[in-house]
Amino acid sequence: MTTIFGSSNAMFLNIEANKENIPPGTEFKKESFVLPEPRVNRTTDPDHENLLPSPVPRPSPAMSQLSDASFLSQDGGAVNTSADEADDDLEVTSRKEKSLGLLCQRFLIAINEETVGSSTREVHLETVARKMNVEKRRIYDIVNVMEALDAMQKTNKSYYQWQGLESLPKLMFDLQNEAVEEGLPERVLRVEQAMCSFTELSSPRGKQGFKDIVGSFVSCTSTPTTPSTSFDSVTVKMEPAGLLEKRSRVDTRDRQGRNSLAQLCRRFLMVLLSNPKNIRKVSLDVASTVLIKDPETEGFEPPSRSRCRRLYDIANVLVALGLIKKVHYLFGTKKIPLFVYCGPEPDQTGSFDVFQSVERLLSSSQNVPQTPIIKAQTDKIVQQIAGFGKRTLSEQNLTKPSGNTPKIAKIKSAAVRSSPMYMENNLFMFAEVVTAEAAAEKMRYDAFAQLSRTILGSVASINSLNAPLTSSQHPMTSRLPPLPMAPLQLPKLPEIPKPQAQKQFTFPATSRPRFNFPDYTPVQSTIRPLVSQMTFPQESSQLHNLDVKPKHLMSNILGESKKFKNNQNTFEHTTSSAFQVVKKGETRPKKVFGEIQNLQ
């Protein structure tokens, strides 16, 4: 039975309802429980805080989880607030900032600061983790990779000696020779061939005969086939049972040593260095199959992602150090990541500066290590190649002419001169060009004609021109027909000396020459006057005084008929019309049908 706070037998809240959540063996004591005073009713006296806390018993751990009064702290009447939670939220950073690649770069900076003035070059991991503001367990993977690269060596608990990465080319030379001795290039090649080939799978009910094989006829006595790979280089050799058991124990012991993070890092570099110089790259599936599984006993199927998790951490640290880079390739329509070796060349006498390599990565925007995050630029290029980011109209489709686009017929004429505007704009209306050119040509023709008349009038009075203009000298001979002209008779002017010619020369008063054209006959002008210039006779006043009646009235029609009869008009409504008009009350004799009527 549940009770309510404030009663004499106040125990707990909702104990009966939460019996299934109470751990077995938990005992509850009957203790009085008092609610704290509401915040509103509390006194604001500063000395109130110095008072002794009320003797309220502390609830048990189980009770603090089950009861609704769990907001009480174990100090008495203090109430927990969300201030501490808000402070914790401010310290929370994004996952990208916690990535292993960025932690590796910060680790190198912290190691450099710790070993600058040290003669022993010994570092303390807790000091480095405190300087990086991370937990100590977060840098263990980085330390293991550094141990695999002979950069750090453990001297004591949490103490390591920094040896540097200057001898990294010599280490790569030794790893490459070890990979060749173990035959690692052949194993990598077999795994790549197995993953890129098709393998025939036999039916589990192969003994039933031809019913399991669709589309073929096989006799019932035929033996089922066994699965075989599609390449000839892989062969299964039968070995004695004792040799297989001994080999399995050795492989198990060797596999246990190779599963460590340091050994896995070395063998991953061996897989990369086993390829030639120009193709030192391997996919994640091939590397995980060669390093984590035994392909000859477990098959060529890539291991699960959970088993490859340690290989991911190794690759992220090596990417941050600038030894490898992650590139995405297309295998058919599937995007697969490849790790490409970009570290120092294997050499016994070479040296390597890891800090310079990291600075080069940070300065280059294309090679910034983003560890588990795919590079935006690479992802965009892969999507365009694979067709994931299709567009409605690509640049190639825009350059091609559409089939529904109407074509404008081009008018080419020798008479129309090409203008710059016409050459630049192909969509210009050619009819307007022709009209504009014709109007401009007509204006030029009129201007030249007027100029020629002016020249002819002035040339007639100049003494220096004794002969008429020839056709070659006239500016408009190709456009105007020659006019019949009589020979000009110009009077001879008296000669005057040259010094006084400019002052005393004047044109003599001569009569204006008249030209006689025998073929010319004047035509009377047919120009009519304007409407505003025309005069009309005024109407008589009698017409204005007449009472004009509508023409559709019967009396008007009869009156017009009488007027026309008086004017000896042959048309009369009463006799000659097809529809005779008869006044009211007047009758006419009927005539026989077919009788010829007198129309006079």
From Swiss-Prot:
Lineage: Eukaryota, Metazoa, Ecdysozoa, Nematoda, Chromadorea
Subcellular location: Nucleus
PANTHER family for this protein: TRANSCRIPTION FACTOR E2F, TRANSCRIPTION FACTOR EFL-3
Organism: Caenorhabditis elegans
Full protein name: Transcription factor efl-3
Gene Ontology CC annotation, any one: RNA polymerase II transcription regulator complex
Keyword annotations from UniProtKB, A to Z: Developmental protein, DNA-binding, Nucleus, Transcription, Transcription regulation
Highest taxon listed in the record's lineage: Eukaryota
Pfam families documented for this protein: E2F_TDP
Family: Belongs to the E2F/DP family.
